[in-house]
Amino acid sequence: MIHYDYLGFKEDLQVASKVYWADLRADYRENLPQKLTRLMKTAGMGQIDFEDKFAAIKLHFGEPGNLAFLRPNWAKAVADFVKERGGKPFLTDCNTLYVGGRKNALDHMDAAMLNGFSPLSTGCQIIIADGLKGNDEVEVPVRGGEYVKNAKIGRAVMDADVFISLTHFKGHEEAGFGGALKNIGMGCGSRAGKMEQHNAGKPHVAQEHCVGCGACTRICAHSGVTVTDRKASIDHSRCVGCGRCIAVCPRDAIRVNWDETVTNLNRKIAEYAQAVVDGRPCFHISLVIDVSPNCDCHAENDAAIIPNVGMFASFDPVALDMACVDAVNAQPPLPGAAAAGDCGHDHFHHLHPETDWMSCLEHAEKLGMGTREYELIKI
């Protein structure tokens, strides 16, 4: 088993990773953001040298209309922890591949502010990591990658000295569940990076939406796009699947074939996450609250499937995801929720039977990101 400490140094250790957790009980002596601060301190996040370091806090701001996303108060607790140790935190996410309220940086910032995220409420700035149109990216080699050789990661994520994931743990219709690895891997991918993970092939033009503006032809470095009779078309013999045409199309006429298998999707997520965390100080926090059946990318959220469990933290994102999914599956389904009924002790597979969430954790473990073996320590 390969173990990585928070600085990325590798040791061959047959040991379980420590995952710390706290329930959601609170009283006049300590509110929940203060309890999260105590969790971070106890779990060792203060060991990281934050002095004069840029610290990216990766979270999901929530699609407008969705109410299951993490409240800004949680982000403020993390940002304050970093600032108190001399660091320079910022909240970040990358633009979405699909049409919605977060497909470019301006809409994304509007969505974040609509959902309560601002420097006033969180104590730090918001930076959309892959820029205005989702094409400000860095190609990062994936050590040991089988599916991805160079991950396309939002530049601001890679410019940060320290990386912290703050994850709302919930279900996901393709990955099975959305945990730390999903938040890091898919979330930190640029629009082209997201396409690479979701798509086994190359994009196509929905010609009924195309107006022949030519933006796609100008951005393509491989002469793979042509416009005839004011309609663009993509020559797949020339297309390399970089996704830049998707980013620049003002009409959202260039579409992805969402045709990657769920197992390969999960393995690509693991490889993208590896590219993000490899070789720098990282820490991971997941909140198992408001566990909705689907991703916070939806413009709505269904009722929570289980009772709220608590907050979890670890240097090991693999162990963290394993601990969180075990915690969810130990809970009874809430009456009337989507997971109600016989779940066979796997709520996420019950919700999304075609998914294969374990493949992500197994592949991340194989890549050396961490271990599924964990010691759960309650504070």
List PLM regions with ranges.
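Extended, low-polarity segments enriched in aliphatic/aromatic residues
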Residues: 9-74, 81-93, 98-379
